[in-house]
Regions:
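Acidic, low-complexity, intrinsically disordered interaction modules
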Residues: 39-107
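Ser/Thr-rich, low-complexity intrinsically disordered terminal regions
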Residues: 31, 105-118
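Charged, low-complexity intrinsically disordered tails and linkers
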Residues: 1-66
Length: 118
């Protein structure tokens, strides 16, 4: 089975960094299987906040990403967010598709990612 974890991480980081409301204000990066996001405003001493967790396949017996609360959870669950917007979810789906992947919610905190077979 092909390791999809690097692609999942790349898509999540790219989507956050390219998302219009965040562009220039936040920077996403990977650290220890976590998608961390830092506020780039020099006035804040932001050490980064975990928005998503991308486990190894063996952890969940599926390639996936998880979000247990926080702003990452709100972005992928817009119908339950305080300030709902479907734009991030649409951008994420588009970026997964461009990477040859398909993402579907398993639950509000876990999204399964599979490779698209053509």
């Amino acid at each position: 089975m092909k390791n999809l974890k690097p692609k999942i991480e790349k898509v999540l980081v790219k989507t956050i960094n390219d998302y219009a409301p965040f562009k220039g204000n936040y920077k996403a990066y990977m650290e220890n299987n976590k998608v961390m996001v830092v506020d780039t405003d020099p006035e804040y001493e932001d050490k980064g906040e975990e928005w998503f967790f991308v486990p190894e396949y063996d952890h969940e017996e599926a390639y996936c990403f998880m979000c247990d609360g926080g702003y990452g959870w709100e972005l992928v669950n817009p119908c339950e967010a305080n300030y709902p917007s479907y734009d991030f979810e649409e951008d994420l789906d588009k970026n997964f598709k461009e990477a040859g992947l398909f993402c579907e919610p398993y639950s509000s905190w876990k999204h399964i990612v599979t490779e698209v077979s053509i």
